[in-house]
Amino acid sequence: MEEALFDVPLYRQFAGLGGMNRLPDRVSILRFRHLLEQHDLAPKMLEAVNATLAAKGLMLKEGTAVDASLIAAPSSTKNNTGTRDPEMHQTKKGNQWYFGMKCHIGVDADSGLVHTVVGTSANVNDVTQAHALVHGEEADVFADAG
């Protein structure tokens, strides 16, 4: 995320960070993520953004594309108690092994705007989360063979 904020001006603008000298470091981003998780705010934030987009006619709801992205972490990643985080697991993608989590995403097929996000361990099969990524109003759902 730190690199994305550095590389993509639109991300900085969306986050209200302004210039390059106000960018948070990895530790600040991680603390913020933990606060979002602790107070269950991420789903509420996504819901508020999506409501704004729908009100402006940008979220069409006629089709959904679903996919997952691997979020790799160092295998030594530990939680607050000093033990390995039980939510992170190992998985194989192609011929390469990874340790971490997966982000399963549902996007509006026409606009490409994200409407649903589900986080799981990296070893969870993409197909098992497909039902959670659709909103039920679609005429079409698109997915890869994953």
Question: Which positions does each model-derived feature cover?
Answer:
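Polybasic low-complexity intrinsically disordered regions
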Residues: 3-6, 15-17, 21-146
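Short alpha-helix boundary/capping elements
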Residues: 9-10
